[in-house]
Amino acid sequence: MCSFFLVLLLWQNMAVPPTYADLGKSARDVFTKGYGFGLIKLDLKTKSENGLEFTSSGSANTETTKVNGSLETKYRWTEYGLTFTEKWNTDNTLGTEITVEDQLARGLKLTFDSSFSPNTGKKNAKIKTGYKREHINLGCDVDFDIAGPSIRGALVLGYEGWLAGYQMNFETSKSRVTQSNFAVGYKTDEFQLHTNVNDGTEFGGSIYQKVNKKLETAVNLAWTAGNSNTRFGIAAKYQVDPDACFSAKVNNSSLIGLGYTQTLKPGIKLTLSALLDGKNVNAGGHKLGLGLEFQA
């Protein structure tokens, strides 16, 4: 009897692999989070007593002076595994999303996503399905377009830290596969390796290393078949203290990104960032960014 419960416990603790879109995510986060070049951004997140979540975001591009904004409300009906989401942005696009998870079957997630633009009359609807269990993560999305539905499928298998994934897109209007991607990787709590091939022409790879509790590093590499130009970058994130972190990255084009995030007080976070051209430091044209995030 004891051995039965031990086997059951080990089985339940087996890792569920990430979705195909999340493969290599840790390395991407080191390269992207904590930066906002050329933007002045304001984010506000609040949650009411009944569980209704409000998220609003606004940004201004310092070069084009264009202002963008969005508003999102989300309500979770935990008892029935339901999540209702309403979205709006300054392009006057309205969106509705309904998700049900772990109700029809354990690990199964169903989402109905629709959007409508009153200005153009454009409508869009998607049905997304996802299923995850030990060693496997499946996804299938159907995008209903005027030209004809398109089907995107993805599969990720995992075993003892090793990951292998495949993603494809089939357009019914063309009756052919228009995208075919493959990825292989290895993942532990402190180290991640990710490689991918997109459509047999684009190749990429990344390495993520958590050196210690304060320091995270990442390297990425990409190139295209028939093009000798290889894209290369390194990045690091250092947690100075519980309320502050510093980020830096550089690529083979000598573009240097710097970011600093400071928690001013609980629920208020300030982010400063700069993008410098290492080849023309004195020429100007560098980009600065400022972000404020409020959460209550």
UniProtKB/Swiss-Prot annotation:
Record-annotated membrane-spanning stretches: 39-46, 52-61, 67-77, 82-89, 93-101, 108-117, 123-132, 136-145, 149-158, 162-171, 178-188, 191-198, 202-211, 215-223, 230-239, 244-251, 255-264, 268-276, 286-296
Sequence positions bearing N6-acetyllysine: K33, K122, K265, K279
Tissue expression notes: High levels of expression detected in heart, kidney, brain, and skeletal muscle. Not expressed in testis.
Location of N6-succinyllysine modifications: K33
Phosphothreonine: residues carrying this PTM: T32, T120
Impact reported for K33R: Decreased localization of SQSTM1/p62 to damaged mitochondria
Entry binding sites for ATP: K25, K33
Binding site for NAD(+): L255, I256, G257, S273, A274, L275, L276, D277
Modified residues (Phosphoserine): S26, S206, S253
Keywords annotated in UniProt: Acetylation, Apoptosis, ATP-binding, Cell membrane, Ion transport, Isopeptide bond, Lipid transport, Lipid-binding, Membrane, Mitochondrion, Mitochondrion outer membrane, NAD, Nucleotide-binding, Phosphoprotein, Porin, Transmembrane, Transmembrane beta strand, Transport, Ubl conjugation
GO-annotated biological processes: apoptotic process; behavioral fear response; calcium import into the mitochondrion; chemical synaptic transmission; epithelial cell differentiation; learning; lipid transport; negative regulation of apoptotic process
Covalent link location (Glycyl lysine isopeptide (Lys-Gly) (interchain with G-Cter in ubiquitin)): K25, K33, K66, K122, K123, K174, K279, K287
Annotated family: Belongs to the eukaryotic mitochondrial porin family.
Subunit structure: Homodimer and homotrimer; in response to cyclic AMP or calcium; oligomerization is required for scramblase activity. Component of the mitochondrial permeability transition pore complex (mPTPC), at least composed of SPG7, VDAC1 and PPIF. Interacts with SPG7, NIPSNAP2 and SLC25A30. Interacts with hexokinases including HK1. The HK1-VDAC1 complex interacts with ATF2. Interacts with BCL2L1. Interacts with BAK1. Interacts with RTL10/BOP (via BH3 domain). Interacts with amyloid-beta and APP; induces VDAC1 dephosphorylation. Interacts with TMEM41B. Interacts with BCAP31.
Domains: entry comment: Consists mainly of a membrane-spanning beta-barrel formed by 19 beta-strands. The helical N-terminus folds back into the pore opening and plays a role in voltage-gated channel activity.
Name this protein carries in UniProt: Non-selective voltage-gated ion channel VDAC1
